[in-house]
Structure formats: C-alpha cells, structure tokens
Design a protein with these regions (language model features):
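Extreme N-terminal starter segment of soluble prokaryotic enzymes
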Residues: 1-4
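An acidic, Ser/Thr-enriched
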Residues: 22-24, 32-43, 224-227, 233-268
Length: 268
C-alpha cells in the first residue's frame, strides 16, 4: 500500500490553535508479476417503474455510481432500465474514466408500469454483445410484479437459463416487501445466479456491490487505518463517510476491500 500525505499549511505557529487539513491518498498495489485479471463484464437491469420513486431508484443509481470507481477503465458496464418500455441509458462498453456513465445516471427518472421481461431480454442482448464470448454477470433489480409483457414464471426462467449458454450469469435483487419473490427466484435459478432480498434501496445497493466484488480481483481485504494523534493535536475529524471505531489513544477507520491499483482519498 502506498500512502501520500499533504497538509494545507506548511507552517503553524506554536500555541496558535490553528486548524490544519490533511489529505491522505492511498493506492493499493497492482497484481503481482505479469498476472492481470481479465476485464469484468457487468450488465445491470434496473426497474424504474413508478413504485421505485420511494427512494429505491435513487439509492440504486447511487450504488452504480460508487461501483464505477471500483471498475478498471477496460471493464465493461452497461445499464438497461425498464418501466412499461425499455431504455438503454448506458450501452454496454468500457468504463473509461467513468464520466459519461455518471452523466447518464443523473438523467434517469421513474416512469410507469413494469415490463420486466423486456428489460431482462434487452439486458441479456447487451451483455452478450459486449462480452465477446467472455463471461458476464447480469443483475436485475426490481421492487414489483411484472404486469406488462411476458409475465409467465417458467418462460422467464427459461429466458434466464438460455443466457447461461452465452456465459451470462443472471442474479436478482428484490426490493421491499411488494416484489414477486417467486418470479425473481425463478429467474436467478434459471440464470445460475443469486437471489437477494433487500429491505430498501440502500440494501439493494449493498447486494449489487457484493455481486460486483465477485467479478473483481481484490488485492486487499478488510483494510483499516489507525489514527493516533500526538499530544499537540487537540482534536481530529474525518470528513469521509466511513465507519470508525474508538481505540486506545485514537480511532480506527474501516476501509474495506481494495482492488488492484485502486486509489482512495481521506480528508482529515
């Protein structure tokens, strides 16, 4: 792990009570030797029907935004959204610097009914197109019941099963207590993936992150940073929204997992 610390002040007068800010930059090591992981292929299929307006859609979009920072420029990411129709805000392709993806996320809003089948089928098409015969993971998030298009459970399970023949794994995340649990379980069963229940949009984002972790090669797990101020420091504050715990003479910041060459910034 490489660390670089920068202060906003070079000199502080003794007993001045000055506030000093510290920017700590961390970079995880790269993979050893010549071994590099293959580009990950992730396709997200997101319900944007009217019922997702309770905050679930926003939380899911924020989760996707945070995932962009964990993906490498050559990783593939695509997003298909559905209500009573299907849109492709992010055509499956390389992440690049993430700017275009984040811009597209800001323009996604809730719509009408729930044509889940069209969203699933379009997502599979995108994943197959972009993966170039490599493995891909499709994650479908929904909070409701399919009420337009194909709604038959065995048929949709068969659609997901057909995707596995193209090296596409299909997982599902059901949000809240009103979604069709049997349908999403059937789809994930057919697609050879996982079926998750999320109490709310924030939990859905956590499950989505968990699915992505399986695609990425982690070089550091359960990382933490110990902060122990000297006697000359009267107080310290972490501006990042990260879990912390008190220890003797300081506190510990939980950083979690870091992938190859991932960069983090902490502001104190």
């Amino acid at each position: 792990m490489e660390l670089d610390a920068k202060l906003d002040l070079n000199v502080v007068a003794v007993d001045s009570g000055e506030t000093v800010h510290l920017l700590l930059e961390l970079e995880a090591p790269g993979l050893e030797g010549e071994r590099r992981r293959d580009p990950a292929n992730l396709q997200v299929v997101l319900d944007r029907s009217g019922s997702m307006g309770d905050g679930s859609l926003l939380a899911a979009l924020q989760a996707i935004d945070s995932l962009v920072g964990k993906l490498s420029p050559d990783d593939q990411l695509g997003l298909v959204c559905f209500d009573d129709s299907v849109i492709v805000p992010i055509a499956a392709g390389p992440v690049g610097d993430g700017g275009a993806i984040r811009s597209a996320l800001r323009h996604i809003h809730t719509g009408g009914m729930t044509n889940l089948s069209s969203g699933l089928m379009r997502g599979i098409q995108e994943a197959d197109r972009a993966s170039a015969d490599r493995a891909a993971t499709l994650v479908l998030l929904s909070d409701g019941h399919a009420n337009e298009g194909v709604t038959d459970h065995p048929t949709l399970e068969g659609v997901a099963k057909g995707a596995t023949g193209h090296k596409i794994t299909v997982s599902t995340i059901g949000i809240g207590h009103g979604y069709d649990e049997d349908l999403l379980e059937a789809i994930s069963r057919g697609g050879g993936g996982n079926s998750h229940f999320a109490e709310n949009g924030d939990e859905a984002g956590a499950h989505l992150a968990g699915e992505v972790e399986g695609l990425l090669e982690q070089v550091i797990q359960a990382a933490s940073l110990t902060v122990k101020p000297t006697g000359d420091v009267s107080g310290i504050r972490l501006y990042n929204d990260l879990p912390t715990s008190e220890i003797k003479d300081g506190f510990m910041v939980e950083l979690g997992e870091l992938v190859s060459e991932e960069k983090r910034r902490l502001l104190f």
